[in-house]
Amino acid sequence: MLKSVIENVHALEIFDSRGNPTVEVHVTLSNGVVGKAEVPSGASTGENEAVELRDGGSRLGGKGVSKAVNNVNTEINDALKGMDPFDQPKIDQTMIDLDGTPNKGRLGANAILGVSMATAVAAANANRQPLYRYLGGIDLEMPQTFHNVINGGEHADNGIDIQEFMITPIAKTSFRDGFEKIVNVYHTLKKVLEDMGYETGLGDEGGFAPNMKNSEEALKALHESIIKAGYKPGEDIGIACDCAASYFYNKEDGKYHLEGKVLTDDELAAYYDKLLDEFPELMSMEDPYDENDVEGMVKFTATHKDRIQIVLDDFICTNPALLKKAIKEGAGNASLIKLNQIGTVTETLETIRMSRKNGYNTMISHRSGETGDTFIADLAVAINGGQLKTGAPARSERVEKYNRLLEIEEELGKGERLAFFPDDVDHD
C-alpha cells in the first residue's frame, strides 16, 4: 500500500473565546484522513513570543487573520504538498525555513502552529491512534491540573495585580476524583465570595473576578473555600499563583508597583515570603519577577527552589534557546509550555525534553483566548507526569479540555495519577 502524504492544507478564520479572530487549519492526507486544529491567543504575552500575524486596518479592530489564513492556503500549502505527515520535524522545519524570520513573523506563528498541530492530528488519525499515544508512546500518566479560579491582572478588570490564583488536587487519586474536588471548591468559592459581598462575574479563563483590595484577600477566600468544601488545604488541595510580574514591573524605576506599594527585588521576595508563611498550601508561583529581571529571578530561585515550584513563562516563552539560558543562570525550576509562544509542535517537544533532562517540571498551558480544541489535553498526558493549567471548571472552551482528560483516563484504565511534584519521574 502506498504511504499517505499531505494532499492539501486549508485554513479559515474563526473566533476564539474572547470574540477575537483566530486560525483553524485542516490537513488532508492522500488517503482521505483529515487533521484539524484551532490556534489559541494570549492576553498577557512575553516579549520573546513568536509573532501572531494580524491584518491591521479597521476590520475587526485590526485583529483579523486573513493574511495568516492566506499564507496557509498558498505558500504553506504549496510547500507541504506531497510531504510525509509522520515526519513532524521536517514539516515544521520546512515552514520555519519558508518563513525566514527568527520569530515566524512573516507567515505568522498562528498560521505555522495551526498547520503543525493539524499535521500531528492527521498523522495520529492515519495511525488510528489517539493523539496522546501518537505524541507520547507507551508510558503515559494523567497530568497534575491547575485551575484558575480567581482572576486578576490582565485577565480581569479588578484591583488585584497578581494575575491568577489557582487550585490543584495534590493527594494521590484518579483524575476524575481530583477534578470533582476542584469542582466542589469552585462552587463553594462562589458562595464564599457572595457572602463577602463580591460580585461573581467570570474572567477570561472562567475564574471569578471579584473587585478585591489585594492578593491576600484572594488567598484567604481560597483557603476558606477549600475548608468549607470539606478538604484540607495543603493535603487535599493546594494553591498556585501566576504573578505575571512583568505587568506590575516599572521599567523606568526598576521596581515593582504592586497593590499600592513600590518594591525592590528583595522587598518583593519579602512580600512573597509573607504570603507563603500565611498560606503554606501555596506551592507554586509563576513569573514572580519580570521577564528581564534576571538578577531578581535567579536570587529568588536560589532561596526558594526547595520551598516552592517556580514556573518560568515570559522568562522563556517555550523557547529552547531561552530555556537553555535560564538553566545556565539558575532561574526557576519549572517550565510553562505554550504551543503558540514558539509556534511548532517540534520546538514545543524540544523545550519539554530539555526541561525534563535538566530536572525542571513542565506545565502545559492554555491561553486566555481559547477554542474548543483539546490538543493540549492530549499533550499533557503524552509527556508523562506533567502538569496542565487550562482554566476554571467553567466556560466550555476550558471544560472541553477537562472532559477530554476524563475520556483519556477512561481509555487508559488507570485509577491513580502522580502526586504533586513527583520525585520518581524519570527526567532523562
UniProtKB/Swiss-Prot annotation:
Top enzyme class: lyase
SUPFAM superfamilies given in the database record: Enolase C-terminal domain-like, Enolase N-terminal domain-like
Residue sites binding Mg(2+) per the record: 242, 286, 313
Localization per record: Cytoplasm; Secreted; Cell surface
Signal sequence extent: none
EC identifiers of the protein: 4.2.1.11
Pathway: Carbohydrate degradation; glycolysis; pyruvate from D-glyceraldehyde 3-phosphate: step 4/5
HAMAP family, A to Z: Enolase
Protein name (record): Enolase
Source taxonomy: Bacteria, Bacillati, Bacillota, Bacilli, Lactobacillales
Protein's gene: eno
